[in-house]
Amino acid sequence: MILDIHTHKAAPQPLAVVDISFITNHEFKAVDGQLYSAGIHPWDTHRDVTPEEWTRLEELLCRPEFVAIGEGGIDLSGRGGMMFRQLNVFKRQIELSESLKKPIIVHCVKAEDVLCGLIRDLKPTQPWIIHGFRKKPQAARQLLNAGCYISLGQHFNPDTLHAIPQDRLLAETDESELSIHCLLYTSPSPRDRQKSR
């Protein structure tokens, strides 16, 4: 069984965790048998999250079909809100992850040091899955050493694949139109890349 750990494709998506856009999707209706995640993306932190929105998010995440929090995280590319707001929103989602005992799917752009600092300070017990990872092996090792899992999608640094232990490596389609099977079976394996060197 292969699980697509993070996709934005509309349900139904068998063997996939569908990320719903919590802030914009006010008419959410679950598809039977579908797995979901929900959270507040750092790009949606340009304003304060209302108490009603936090309540609604927690109610969704308490449902059994919601198997993960996120995608949430920190984006220092300039697309997210002010850093203090991103941190406040992400910390609240970390609290939900811990209290509900569900993993958190993390959006991390130019923020590896920030994430590692949060892990060191907060000592979370639930898995952190860094989604859509495209960086070099050194950045992967930094996050792996902090205890994170790494999820690769359609675009990734092939050298990074060597740095990720199999038991910490996940796959995702994210916004790709390709299926998870197509992504996995058309990407070069570490063994194939070693032969080509």
PLM feature spans:
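Conserved small/polar residues in nucleotide/adenosyl-binding loops
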Residues: 185-192
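Divalent metal-binding pocket/active-site signature
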Residues: 10, 58-145
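A short acidic, helix-capping loop that chelates divalent metal ions and anchors anionic groups
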Residues: 42-47, 75-81, 179-181
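Active-site beta-loop-alpha junctions enriched in small/polar residues
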Residues: 8, 23, 39-43, 73, ...
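Glycine-rich anion/phosphate-binding loops
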Residues: 46-56
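Short acidic/histidine-rich active-site segments
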Residues: 167-182
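Divalent metal-dependent hydrolysis catalytic cores, especially in the metallo-beta-lactamase
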Residues: 1-45, 67-68
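Structural preference for beta-strand elements that scaffold enzyme active sites
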Residues: 2, 35-37, 67-68, 103-105, ...
